[in-house]
Amino acid sequence: MPHIDIKCFPRELDEQQKAALAADITDVIIRHLNSKDSSISIALQQIQPESWQAIWDTEIAPQMETLIKKPGYSM
């Protein structure tokens, strides 16, 4: 731990871009949470736009109070 779960609309990321994203996020987590590299895991799930409402309903809206970065949109 920690585990970071990124959900986004589909992106054309090759393996090198995914690795760079993971490295950047890992560096931030190490710096701010004093975690070890070996304890960090990161998931990247690409969600179709027509399925985003379900993410909003189950993961974003119910946790609005605990989000450290709130979205600038509502559904």
From Swiss-Prot:
Q: Record's Pfam families? A: Tautomerase
Which spans of this chain does the record mark as coiled coil? Answer: none
Signal sequence segment: none
Query: Its Enzyme Commission number?
Result: 5.3.2.-
State the InterPro entries in the record.
4-OT-like_dom (IPR004370), Tautomerase/MIF_sf (IPR014347), Tautomerase_PptA (IPR017284)
Subcellular location as annotated? Cytoplasm
Its primary localisation, in coarse terms, equals: cytoplasm
Keyword terms of this UniProt record: Cytoplasm, Isomerase
The record's GO molecular-function terms, alphabetically, read: intramolecular oxidoreductase activity, interconverting keto- and enol-groups
What positions does UniProt annotate as the active site of this protein? Answer: 2
Q: Which GO terms describe its cellular component?
A: cytoplasm
Q: How does it assemble?
A: Homodimer.
Q: Which family does it belong to?
A: Belongs to the 4-oxalocrotonate tautomerase family. PptA subfamily.
Can you say what this protein is called? Answer: Tautomerase PptA
Gene giving rise to this polypeptide: pptA
